[in-house]
From Swiss-Prot:
Subunit composition and interactions: Component of the 19S proteasome regulatory particle complex. The 26S proteasome consists of a 20S core particle (CP) and two 19S regulatory subunits (RP). The regulatory particle is made of a lid composed of 9 subunits, a base containing 6 ATPases and few additional components including PSMD4. Interacts with NUB1. Interacts with SQSTM1. Interacts with UBQLN4. Interacts with UBE3A. Interacts with UBQLN1 (via ubiquitin-like domain). Interacts with DDI2.
Annotated segments matching region Interaction with UBQLN1: 197-262
Residues with the Phosphothreonine modification: T250, T253
Official protein name in the record: 26S proteasome non-ATPase regulatory subunit 4
Gene name linked to the record: PSMD4
Amino acid sequence: MVLESTMVCVDNSEYMRNGDFLPTRLQAQQDAVNIVCHSKTRSNPENNVGLITLANDCEVLTTLTPDTGRILSKLHTVQPKGKITFCTGIRVAHLALKHRQGKNHKMRIIAFVGSPVEDNEKDLVKLAKRLKKEKVNVDIINFGEEEVNTEKLTAFVNTLNGKDGTGSHLVTVPPGPSLADALISSPILAGEGGAMLGLGASDFEFGVDPSADPELALALRVSMEEQRQRQEEEARRAAAASAAEAGIATTGTEDSDDALLKMTISQQEFGRTGLPDLSSMTEEEQIAYAMQMSLQGAEFGQAESADIDASSAMDTSEPAKEEDDYDVMQDPEFLQSVLENLPGVDPNNEAIRNAMGSLASQATKDGKKDKKEEDKK
């Protein structure tokens, strides 16, 4: 088995936001890096893998380590920003490989390029010659911007391979298919051993052989199960919300119908008593029932007469009250006292005195007339 130390260079430029690889270039790259890391560590437990970004000053996320979990945790913190500097990233990866612990390990760089390479072809060829001299192999996954980068990257890889034509690889992946699937079937992983060699993602569930990497297969299965449960929960909530909206009108109608039914029953129970079957009653029972009905009728009649007397008393009291008010208003002395208390009114005014005099004479005439009528009676 080959002992190898590998530095994985990931593209974290703004171009990785594009969705030509589902769901985005960045997430498709994460899946592919996951496969690369597990393939390298599975082929030989002593193999080491490191991680570096090509944008934002080419930051080394993890140094060489056999711990794939640490690498993947750092990988998922990468956010797209800026532009890549391909040559600088490859130089930093080469420097990290020089500090590997196992000096007998072969050196390899796997670079994911998903944005335009701005370095000119001359600089790329010069860098490739230096890496060939240092016996460093470079595999490049060219995706997303293959029309711009293919020519430059082909010259870079051909310079690395030299006359032998082996050791380094360039894999160009067109938009559409899964980046991870294309990588599995590519020559980059050929000869590394393990169950994933020569297999497509469709040969095993999630593209991983459970017997070769049970932990990864279990993690993928748990992730898919959680996603399925979330989707089912969202669908259940949406169905419940729509059912609740549709049931509001029906519930209101049922409630009103129930209330009407209860009201009808209560009216039937309390407002109207059922008539007894007289044919099934004895003569004594019929006499007792007749006496009871007559007593109820008498009570009802007394209540009605009391209501009538009360209403008639109210009617007779109202005219008497009106007559008392009229007599008070016709009293000259009362009016004179009222006028004296009103502000701005002069009781000695000639017009007011004439009006009061006519009112007094009218009251005298009415008094004499009432006296004559009483004498006649």
